[in-house]
């Protein structure tokens, strides 16, 4: 589950629908990414990061 992405989205006061519209994907895609059911392309990751004001490491790096 991508809690980091969800928290960053909530910190920007964006709904899944709003974020999806800004980056040009469906709300379902955002939901699947946040739930860990979809691995986005690097391009999509970069677009999400731009909108949320985060780096790829901030949102998608997993500490093991």
Model-derived regions, located:
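Short, Lys/Arg-enriched, disordered terminal segments
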Residues: 1-3, 64
């Amino acid at each position: 589950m991508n809690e980091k992405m969800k928290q960053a989205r909530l910190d920007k006061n964006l709904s899944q629908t709003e974020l999806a519209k800004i980056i040009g994907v469906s709300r379902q895609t955002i939901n699947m990414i946040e739930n860990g059911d979809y691995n986005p392309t690097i391009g999509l990751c970069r677009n999400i990061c731009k909108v949320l004001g985060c780096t790829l490491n901030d949102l998608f790096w997993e500490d093991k």
